[in-house]
Amino acid sequence: MAGMLEYKCPCCDGAIKFDSATQKMKCPYCDTEFEVDTLKGYDEELKDEKPSEMEWATPGGSWAEGETAGLHTYSCKSCGGEIVGDDTMAASACPFCGNPIVLTGQFAGALRPDLIIPFKLDKKAAKAKLQEHLKGKTLLPRVFRSQNHIDEVKGVYVPFWLFDSDADAQLRFTATRTRSWSDSKYDYTETNYYSVRRDGTLGFDAVPVDGSSKIEDDLMESIEPFAMQDAIPFQTAYLAGYVADKYDVTAEDSIERANRRIRRSTEETFQQTVTGYDSVKVENSSIQLHGGKAKYALFPVWLLSTSWRGENYLFAMNGQTGKFCGDLPVDKGAARKWMLGLTAALSAASYGVMWLLWLARIL
């Protein structure tokens, strides 16, 4: 069965219908009329659109003979995490959940990274950033401030898929201008609606999508961006003293997230060009991606995993820029005291205002 085509009014977002009396398209909600040919043009553009999705060229680098001789795989029985380290690795705890890890054998069976961004900041800087992150948090449990938890900070190379693509975009925005005035009887507000169009092409390079399921996507996106000018061809020597998370989300499985990020950025970029209005929102967008390819990279991240009353908390710091992020637990006892104090303060303030108003009436 054919799908039903629906036009939305750029003025009020209502569904436009054909008015047989005027032979025009008319919005039944705001009575705005449109010529049929105007909306027909949108149909013709949509007919000429390319498929919205494309086939990405995904990476497939292989290791040179003997290149992985000094690399070993370690696994965590608690969270399933799997990391890679060299002969010098001294870590004995999982960077994702803090539980013990065990050596499972010689590293094998994964793609060779194309690029790596070496660590720019050391463990001392990570500790300082963590202390800064904890500073001023009155509802934070005291255990989070103990030095032994800070010492669990670990340097991890996190796997990322980097996507390049061009985006051809046709977008229509609804924009408004509002003015207000008053007379002796009434206040007036007039809102004018405008339909604004933007067409163009944007190029995207190295749009990152992390390839680890053990780390929340929001956490990794929160410590972006990574400066790609520091990315260099991968060498195993950079793993010395650190561990590398072994990817468990393939490039193919990351394409959907990459497409969403590119489309969202395209809409935001074009929307920023629609200026001089009081409000702007996307009404309709047609974005086709082409020329897509992906690379495999390792990015430096300092991780701290700790627990509080059965809940695990993972903090992350960009090992290149120092950007820090992570959710904090709340001491429920301290929170209750804080709420009681706030309630008492508000009650006292309300009583004071009421007393002043009563006093003013007497005077």
Question: Can you name each region flagged by the protein language model?
Answer:
Residues 18-19, 36-37, 85-86, 103-104:
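Short, non-ligating residues that shape and space the ligands of small metal-coordination modules
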Residues 4-6, 22-24, 69-73, 91:
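Residues immediately within or flanking Cys/His clusters that coordinate Zn2+
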Residues 337-355:
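Final/C-terminal transmembrane alpha-helix of multipass membrane proteins
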Residues 9-12, 27-30, 76-79, 94-97:
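Short cysteine-rich clusters marking metal-coordination/redox-active sites
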Residues 111-307, 358-363:
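Charged, low-complexity helical/coil segments in non-catalytic cytosolic or luminal regions
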Residues 299-328:
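Extended, hydrophilic extramembrane loops/domains of integral membrane proteins
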Residues 2-4, 35-71, 105-132:
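Intrinsically disordered, low-complexity segments
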